[in-house]
């Protein structure tokens, strides 16, 4: 008689206290995405200006970036999951400063803030300029 394959159903997400994490702020010209990971790089929570209800050109505003950053950080602080964080800011968008300000005002102790915007050392040729 053939043996039946049994599957194990494990919970997908386990709630674990990270206490120390890394907050990545990706500020593009159109949107701002904030991701919180643990020290190993496993994503714990995320938010963006579009996910907070801002649509169209309102997504690129500094207020939308502030709302997205405050949203993701407040959920983790209220659950007691995050006490100390490192902040990595990437991109040239208008919401990078206000997102950092919202993270600093949330009560999380920031160990350091680093700008990791990729800058070419004269690598690839950029695309031609738009003419509108």
Curated annotation (Swiss-Prot):
GO MF term list: rRNA binding; structural constituent of ribosome
Subunit structure, as described in the record: Part of the 30S ribosomal subunit.
Family of this protein: Belongs to the universal ribosomal protein uS11 family.
GO terms (BP aspect): translation
Protein name: Small ribosomal subunit protein uS11c
Protein localization: Plastid, Chloroplast
Pfam families: Ribosomal_S11
Cellular component terms per the entry's GO annotation: chloroplast; ribonucleoprotein complex; ribosome
Disulphides: none
HAMAP family membership: Ribosomal_uS11 (MF_01310)
Superkingdom of this protein's organism: Eukaryota
NCBIfam families found in the cross-reference section: PRK05309.1
Keywords attached to this entry: Chloroplast, Plastid, Ribonucleoprotein, Ribosomal protein, RNA-binding, rRNA-binding
């Amino acid at each position: 008689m053939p043996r039946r394959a049994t599957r194990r159903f494990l919970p997908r997400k386990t709630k674990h206290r990270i206490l120390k994490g890394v907050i990545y702020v990706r500020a593009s010209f159109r949107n701002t995405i904030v991701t919180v990971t643990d020290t190993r790089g496993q994503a714990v929570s995320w938010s963006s200006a579009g996910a907070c209800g801002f649509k169209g050109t309102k997504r690129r505003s500094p207020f939308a970036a502030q709302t997205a950053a405050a949203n993701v950080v407040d959920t983790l602080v209220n659950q007691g999951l995050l006490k100390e964080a490192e902040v990595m800011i990437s991109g040239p968008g208008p919401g990078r400063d206000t997102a950092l300000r919202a993270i600093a005002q949330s009560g999380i102790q920031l160990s350091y803030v680093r700008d990791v915007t990729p800058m070419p050392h004269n690598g690839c040729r950029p695309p031609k300029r738009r003419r509108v």
